[in-house]
Amino acid sequence: MMIPLQKLLQFYKWNDTHIDIGKCQELKEKGFLQIKEHSKYPLYILNYTSKTQLKQKWCKELIHARGLVVAEDGEIIARSMPKFFNHYEIRGELQEQDYELYKKLDGSLAIMFHYKGNRIFCTRGSFLSDQALRAEQIFKKNYIDEDVNKECTYCFEVIYPQNKIVVDYGDVEDLFLLSIIHTKTGKNVTM
């Protein structure tokens, strides 16, 4: 099933500071949204499910639920990159515009943000995945926290030997910056 492009573009323009918790609960009950709680903080990570992809039941909450971290009241604490679509999933013409091209790396998405003075890593659907924990270790070892803007969410590709997806990077163990998103506004920050 193809989705009309104009409908999708409306969903991407989202600078709300809160998400509708009631709508999220409804989406979870219908099997379209996965919600996992942080073990230490009153935070929740939202991720769309494979059912959402199969049924193509997209709304703004689901398009942005790709590692979206929220507080109990729905305040957005961290924003990852929204869902991206394959060319055969969208009906309509994209308008020509400026773009930047990046090399696609073959690792896992790691999301870094700050909450009440603490740096936190997660993946699309977990605060405690091996990839999130390794990303934290790599960051501590190689980078300085004072260099990051605490009002932003950082999206990385985490690559290390034990996390080989398809491409074998040998002994490479590092974080590769994909994007920086201002958490309150949802706007991309120039890298």
Name every feature range the model reports, one short phrase each:
Residues 1-191:
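Core nucleotide-handling region used for phosphoryl-transfer chemistry
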